A protein has these predicted regions:
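Loop/turn positions that initiate beta-strands
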Residues: 54-56, 224, 319
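Short beta-strand-centered interaction patches in the first periplasmic/extracellular domains
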Residues: 86, 93-95, 133-199, 333-340
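Short, charged/polar, Gly/Pro-enriched secondary-structure boundary elements
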Residues: 45, 95-101, 182-190, 259-261, ...
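Surface-exposed cap/loop segments at beta↔alpha junctions
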Residues: 45-132, 142-143
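Right-handed beta-helix
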Residues: 157, 167, 218, 313-423
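Juxtamembrane "anchor/assembly" segments of surface/extracellular structural proteins
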Residues: 1-52, 92-96, 177-219, 223, ...
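Amphipathic, non-transmembrane alpha-helical segments in extracytoplasmic/periplasmic proteins
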Residues: 37-38, 73, 91, 106-129, ...
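Exposed beta-strand/loop interface patches that mediate assembly or binding
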Residues: 230-237, 242, 246-360
Length: 423
């Protein structure tokens, strides 16, 4: 329902507001923009509170139909006061839709750039993206989205380039900028009154600082817009707006640049991801990870470091099941380290095993039988049902004491002569 807030502002939401007392929103890099609205409606009006959650809300200026905020309601509270209901709405930019469903997948096409990787992640989740950074920088090694939302993953990718992500707040669609928004040049602000901020950067040895300037205006500008202030070329790195007592005032944070700490997915330390070997090259393996549904996502070859060390190891073959390990929180330092068999392979392995010696002697270990064979066709076969011995020449059974043969039937066969002697 549309409501006119004042002579220049309109709001559209599912709440049948009779009046809006105040609202404010904040728009900063690396976080969803947040809007909070305080308003009143008649207590007898039923607006279906349960339908408000996850519904859209938009605020715009009547002149030029310029949108100030367009997002989704994430929280609603109400309080009855006489004949009125006091309703408070909290909403977030539509980028929050990209921050709801954690996923796991890998990006192993290492010749692709950071921008291309971020674009694929966002667009595969139904979002939109504009890349102002990372268009020339290849990822070089695989990056992995592990138990992360698309928003968290792209934010982490951006931090590897020393930049940020910026949510879109005007389209009402899940969209973002990868890198600071490339804004327009705007008229200078008044320098009669402003605040200077000096703060330590988020990373480093604590000695680095960054300086920002806060100033107010009635005009609406956007993140990334450029302005000359105090003789310096600055950019807008923060926008906040407050409507109160019928007046809308914007407050801007101006900086020449911003430093962003490199972010990691901490769960990678000690993690192992299983997959299937697709190809082997010297002491490297190409792996289709299970988190990708067993499909290859690039042609990267992981180094193979067996758990046995450098001695007595063999490279896994195509189709073998292996595990890719991560010794730190940096997923770009993964390596293949263990090859294992599935349940059916284990059974096949134990059903038939064979050891061949250089002199042609052989030991066969079967499921129901153990067989020993010498180079001269001597053999011994042991099973649950019988024992068999054979020799192509002489077969001698000797003992220092007694030899006892006991059975229901004993058969001794000789082609030429049978001698049983006593010394």
């Amino acid at each position: 329902m549309e409501i006119k807030i004042n002579h220049e502002l309109w709001m559209d939401s599912r709440v049948a507001f009779q009046s809006v007392a105040e609202f404010h929103f904040e728009w900063m890099p690396n976080q969803h923009a947040v809007l909070e609205v305080d308003g009143y409606t008649d207590r007898d009006i039923l607006y279906g509170k349960e339908t408000i959650y996850d519904s859209k809300i938009r605020i715009w200026k009547e002149q030029n139909n310029e949108t100030l905020f367009y997002g989704y309601v994430v929280n609603v509270t109400e309080e009855v006061a006489g004949r009125l209901k006091h309703i408070q709405i909290k909403a977030e930019s539509a980028s929050c839709r990209l921050d709801q469903n954690p996923k796991s997948r890998s990006f192993q096409a290492v010749d692709q750039t950071y921008a291309e990787t971020a674009r694929k992640a966002v667009e595969d989740s139904g979002g939109q993206i504009i890349c102002t950074e990372g268009n020339e920088m290849p990822i070089k090694k695989p990056v992995i989205q592990y138990g992360e939302t698309v928003w968290a993953f792209t934010r982490r990718l951006a931090s590897h380039l020393g930049t940020c992500v910026v949510p879109d707040i005007t389209s009402g669609e899940p969209a973002l900028w990868f890198g600071m928004r490339n804004g327009s040049a705007i008229p200078p602000f008044s320098e009669n009154e402003y605040t200077i901020q000096i703060a330590r950067t988020e990373h480093g040895d604590g000695k680095q600082t960054e300086t920002g300037y806060e100033t107010e205006s009635r005009a609406y500008y956007k993140l990334g817009d450029k302005v000359v202030f105090g003789g310096q070329r600055l950019h807008i790195y923060g926008v906040s707006a407050r409507f109160q007592h019928g007046e809308l005032i914007f407050r801007y944070l101006l900086k020449s640049r911003a430093d962003y700490a490199k972010l990691y997915q901490e769960q990678f330390t000690g993690l192992g991801l299983t997959g299937t070997v697709v190809d082997v090259r010297k002491e490297e393996v190409q792996v289709a990870l299970d988190i990708d549904g067993g499909k290859t996502t690039g042609e990267y070859y992981y180094d193979w470091y067996p758990v046995t060390g450098n001695a007595l190891y063999a490279m896994p073959e195509k189709g073998a099941r292996v595990e890719v390990y991560f010794g730190s929180r940096d997923e770009q330092r993964g390596f293949g380290g263990e090859c294992f068999l599935n349940a059916s392979d284990y059974r096949d392995f134990y059903i038939f095993r064979q050891l061949n010696a250089v002199n042609r002697s052989r030991i066969n270990l079967f499921d129901q039988n153990v067989y020993f064979s010498g180079a001269e066709k001597n053999n011994l076969s042991l099973s649950d049902g019988y024992i068999s011995m054979g020799n192509s020449r002489n077969l001698e059974i000797s003992s220092r004491k007694n030899i006892i043969m006991g059975a229901k039937k004993v058969v001794v066969i000789a082609l030429d002569e049978l001698n049983i002697c006593q010394d």
